């Protein structure tokens, strides 16, 4: 009897069952990847790359350590993936600083987007900040290049506004660094912030309040003569 004769017929019902099985397998894989990355971001944020252990990451998820290696091969690959997950949100925020937009619209939108990244990805954000303090040596090169180009685009936007008299003249590099530091302070300096706020973890309303305060301070400081009446408060 031929092999073809012994195989089950490829009926529509069989094909539907195979498609369901494939979909379920893909769903399990995506779920495991998401859970492992979340657990890894928590471990790396708390302990850094060197001290974080793969078995502790697996324990957070409730999976065998072998499963972590199955999906990511080694801890270094997993760390790189954690860092990569924050790149796209940061780039989306950076894209909001556009020279064709008025600064009173673009700057608050950029500040709010940066604060949203910190709020929605607190552990990953902290892990990335820790890596940057070490020189971003383990950040994948393509990610670093995209972030570098986005920063250059943001500087060009700030220069354009200054040259057209839309905002007061200042060193655009210093201004961009200030925007970065102001929007990541709650994540980077959590303990220091708690001394002022009395909260161990900021709530969503706290992030919104910080975004509004920073926006008003920045717009007020950058207002040029005759422009203060034109700059309107940013509604959050």
PLM regions: where:
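Hydrophobic alpha-helical connector segments
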Residues: 95-124, 172-179, 208-211, 227-228, ...
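Short hydrophobic clusters on alpha-helical segments that form packing/core surfaces
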Residues: 32, 36-44, 114, 218
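Amphipathic alpha-helical segments used for helix-helix packing
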Residues: 106, 119-141, 189-197
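Short coil/turn segments at alpha/beta junctions that flank glycine-rich nucleotide-binding fingerprints
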Residues: 46-50, 100, 121, 164
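Amphipathic alpha-helical linker/stalk segments
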Residues: 23, 82-109, 151-160
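Hydrophobic/aromatic residues within well-ordered alpha-helical segments
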Residues: 32, 75, 82, 86, ...
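Helix-turn-helix
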Residues: 35, 43-77, 81
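C-terminal peripheral helix-coil segments that are non-catalytic and often amphipathic
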Residues: 1-20, 116, 120, 148, ...
């Amino acid at each position: 009897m031929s092999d073809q004769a012994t195989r089950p017929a490829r009926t529509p019902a069989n094909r539907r069952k195979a498609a369901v099985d494939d979909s379920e397998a893909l769903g399990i894989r995506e779920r495991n990847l998401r859970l492992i990355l979340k657990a890894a971001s928590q471990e790396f944020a708390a302990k850094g790359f060197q001290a974080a252990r793969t078995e502790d990451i697996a324990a957070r998820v409730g999976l065998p350590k072998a499963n972590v290696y199955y999906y990511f091969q080694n801890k270094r690959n997993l760390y790189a993936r954690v860092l990569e997950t924050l790149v796209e949100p940061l780039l989306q925020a950076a894209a909001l600083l556009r020279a064709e937009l008025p600064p009173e619209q673009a700057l608050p939108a950029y500040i709010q987007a940066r604060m949203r990244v910190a709020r929605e990805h607190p552990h990953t954000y902290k892990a990335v900040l820790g890596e940057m303090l070490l020189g971003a040596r383990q950040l994948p090169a393509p990610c670093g290049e995209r972030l570098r180009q986005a920063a250059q685009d943001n500087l060009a936007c700030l220069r354009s506004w200054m040259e057209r008299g839309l905002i007061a003249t200042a060193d655009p590099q210093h201004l961009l660094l200030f925007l970065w530091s102001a929007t990541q302070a709650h994540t980077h300096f959590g303990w220091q912030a708690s001394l002022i706020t009395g909260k161990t973890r900021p709530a969503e309303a706290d992030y919104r309040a910080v975004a509004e305060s920073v926006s008003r301070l920045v717009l007020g400081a950058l207002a040029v003569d005759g422009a203060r009446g034109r700059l309107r408060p940013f509604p959050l």
